[in-house]
C-alpha cells in the first residue's frame, strides 16, 4: 500500500491529472503525469477498467501496479502526480513486465518536454 500522502485520491485529482497531464504509453500501461505543488511528494493513482478483466483480474493487476510503483515513485520529481491506467493487455503481464513498462514511462515523465517548433503556413 502506498502511504496516504503518496496517493491521488479524489475524483478531482484524478480528473486533473487525466485531462491536463502529459500522456505516455509504455507496454500495457498509460501514464498521465502533471506537475502540481512543488513541495509535496510524488503521488500516484491507478485506473484499471472493466476491459482488463473480471474483478479478480483487475484487483491482481492493481496490486501488481501498486507494488511496482511503490519502489519507483521516489524517482519522480517532487510535486509530480501520476495516474497509471492499465490497458487490457496488462491482465496477461507479469509483475516484471509491468515494472519495465513503469520504468520506461517514468523515464519519459522525468525528461523535459521537447519544444514544439512553430509551423509556418
From Swiss-Prot:
Q: Which GO terms describe its biological process?
A: tRNA 5'-leader removal
Q: Name one GO cellular component term.
A: ribonuclease P complex
Q: What keyword terms does UniProt attach to this protein?
A: Endonuclease, Hydrolase, Nuclease, RNA-binding, tRNA processing
A Gene Ontology molecular function term of the record: 3'-tRNA processing endoribonuclease activity
Could you tell me the EC number(s) of this protein?
3.1.26.5
UniProt KW tRNA processing keyword? yes
What domain of life does the UniProt record list for this protein's source?
Answer: Bacteria
Where is the region Disordered?
Answer: 1-20, 91-121
The subunit structure is: Consists of a catalytic RNA component (M1 or rnpB) and a protein subunit.
* Record's function text: RNaseP catalyzes the removal of the 5'-leader sequence from pre-tRNA to produce the mature 5'-terminus. It can also cleave other RNA substrates such as 4.5S RNA. The protein component plays an auxiliary but essential role in vivo by binding to the 5'-leader sequence and broadening the substrate specificity of the ribozyme.
The protein, known as: Ribonuclease P protein component
Q: Which organism is it from?
A: Parafrankia sp. (strain EAN1pec)
Query: What gene makes this protein?
Result: rnpA
Amino acid at each position: 500500500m502506498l502511504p496516504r500522502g503518496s496517493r491521488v485520491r479524489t475524483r478531482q485529482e484524478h480528473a486533473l491529472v487525466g485531462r491536463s497531464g502529459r500522456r505516455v504509453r509504455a507496454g500495457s500501461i498509460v501514464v498521465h503525469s502533471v506537475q502540481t505543488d512543488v513541495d509535496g511528494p510524488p503521488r500516484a493513482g491507478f485506473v484499471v477498467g472493466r476491459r482488463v478483466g473480471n474483478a479478480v483480474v483487475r484487483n491482481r493487476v492493481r496490486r501488481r501496479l501498486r507494488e511496482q510503483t511503490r519502489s519507483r515513485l521516489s524517482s519522480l520529481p517532487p510535486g509530480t502526480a501520476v495516474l497509471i491506467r492499465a490497458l487490457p493487455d496488462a491482465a496477461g503481464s507479469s509483475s516484471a513486465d509491468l515494472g519495465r513498462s513503469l520504468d520506461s514511462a517514468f523515464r519519459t515523465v522525468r525528461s523535459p518536454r521537447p519544444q514544439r517548433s512553430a509551423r509556418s503556413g
